[in-house]
């Protein structure tokens, strides 16, 4: 891991960028703090056209930097947030084309909010806090084989994302995929606790794989505030659930769907291709 000071780290990254390098690899200490990440983002921000405003960067700018960070266990909140009122080095997020976090286990809230990257890989991340990748409108490739917990709206407004695999994910906050209008397939075979408006405005969905669902937040009693919302035609969606799935019932006092003791397999809901108030193209148990 680097023994550099923040100034030395900033200078090293700046030199690499000035030499025309676009593949930037940095090895940080496990406990690297926000000041070390700021040294990196301050250098990256200088590669972005200063005449472009925030709107132009978010909507139209294509990043050119492939960034790999190893060693560090946590990416601090708002590190690459593209917002001039939140992040001093806000242009750095627009510089990114791809991000690889080889050793990180936690990604802080809004860490990559509205960044320009198309590819994101974090093989050892266990938890991603709320809004961390929200608004990454060019993001198409995501590799998160170990993540177990996703906070609210982690992938909200990732308009280009078509498919995602979350093989170890158990807990999803509210609106994780809200407005992912190109999203076609979601594979989360261990997901048991789901938030409200999880798939709101995911109008391209064709297949969703979940685990043995135990709870689903619906916020209000209206199905409009449920997992899929009425904006989606769930009759075009193939739903896959665990063979251990139980029938769900709605608790109006808590605004949650909760699993009962009754097997879903062979139930009226199953026979009617229904789950938590929605009717699907098919409901398969595996």
Name each region found by the language model.
Residues 25-31, 61-74, 88-106, 115-127, ...:
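Structural signature of tandem-repeat unit edges
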Residues 88, 252-273:
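Surface-exposed intrinsically disordered loops and tails
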């Amino acid at each position: 891991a680097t023994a550099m000071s923040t100034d030395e780290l900033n200078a090293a990254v700046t030199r690499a960028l000035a030499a025309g390098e676009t593949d930037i690899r940095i090895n940080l200490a496990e406990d690297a703090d926000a000041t070390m990440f700021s040294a990196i983002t301050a250098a990256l921000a200088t590669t972005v056209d200063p005449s472009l405003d925030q709107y132009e960067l978010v909507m139209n700018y294509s990043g050119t930097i492939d960034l790999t960070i190893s060693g560090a266990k946590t990416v601090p909140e708002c590190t690459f947030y593209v917002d001039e009122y939140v992040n001093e080095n806000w242009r750095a997020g627009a510089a990114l084309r791809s991000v690889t976090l080889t050793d990180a286990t936690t990604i802080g809230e809004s860490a990559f909010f509205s960044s320009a990257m198309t590819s994101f890989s974090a093989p050892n991340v266990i938890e991603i806090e709320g809004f961390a990748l929200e608004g990454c409108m060019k993001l198409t490739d995501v590799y998160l084989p170990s993540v177990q917990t996703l906070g609210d709206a982690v992938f909200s407004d990732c308009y280009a994302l078509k498919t995602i695999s979350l093989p170890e994910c158990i807990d999803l906050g509210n609106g994780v995929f809200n407005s992912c209008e190109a999203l076609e397939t979601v594979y989360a075979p261990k997901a048991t606790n789901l938030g409200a408006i999880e798939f709101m405005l995911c109008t391209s969905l064709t297949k969703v794989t979940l685990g043995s669902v135990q709870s689903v937040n619906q916020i209000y009693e209206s199905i409009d505030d449920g997992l899929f919302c009425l904006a989606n035609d769930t009759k075009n969606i193939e739903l896959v659930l665990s063979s251990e799935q139980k029938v769900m019932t709605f608790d109006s006092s808590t605004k949650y769907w909760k699993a009962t003791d009754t097997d879903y397999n062979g139930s009226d809901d199953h026979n009617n291709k229904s789950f938590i108030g929605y009717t699907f193209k098919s409901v398969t148990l595996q």
